[in-house]
Amino acid sequence: MAPKGWPLLLESLGWSDPELWWSHWQQRGGFELARRVWPADVKDQWLLGVALPLLSQAESLLQMGGRPLLGLSALPGCGKTTLCDWLVHASSELGWSIAFLSIDDFYWPGPELDRRMAGNPWGVPRAIPGSHDLELMATALDQWRETGELLAPRFDKSLRDGRGDRSEWVRSTPDLVVLEGWFVGVLVSDQASEAENIHSLALTTEELVYRQQLFRLVPDYAPIWNRIDKLWHLKGQSGTSSRLWKRQQVETQAKTTGVHVSESAVQDFVRMIETAFPAAWLQDLHQSDVVIDLTNQRAVREITLK
């Protein structure tokens, strides 16, 4: 069953008749398109309500030309990396050239990253504002748009005992780039800050002080967000959805790769996600074009357009 708002999304992508849209994708493989990328238990509703419409968005942007940048924002553990990986493989099968970048690829090199993350109250080695080389990110995106060549670093989170480091540089010539991250599109909102229930978070003095430092860094990301042509937001049921999703992600990672993350590290990371920003900053992205509301089980509840 298609989620609420799905027909309007298709219409915004140039498909007024959902049956014609479905026929279009059935001829290209439908749910079997790049199926190998998905976990065995992927739901058809996810493919119908999220994956194939996102592929349609990419197709629409490619038809417009100009080397478009498609943004994808979602809390950690939501499945956005797998979604982007599928998008690249599906596009390749269709003969399109699409690449995806995470803002995490632009973390500072190890020693500089350690310096910038020192003293944060959650003890996280990365992920928060200030951990990214924004000048490098802007340069990589701008040079790609000007020349067609994308040169970007990759970050391996398993290096340096889990603190991570740059591992390689990748050169490609995509016609479209997807930029994903857990706070892509987040902007400072005084109104949301005022509405926040500080007491319910039980913020420590250290957290209160440090998050003000983060708030001052958030505007530095706006020039990157402004480069995005279309922004999709996979919105969790609440600001605490990542608590469940991250644990599931860590469990899956341990089973598939043998890499284990300590319980304390998971707790620190989740605490950071829940307290680094007011929840409304993550839940209500003013620049988003498509919002897909998800349950804690990652089922699509509703799709809205902005």
For the regions a protein language model found, what residue spans apply to each?
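Post-Walker A helix-loop "phosphate-sensing" segment adjacent to the P-loop in P-loop NTPases
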Residues: H89-A99
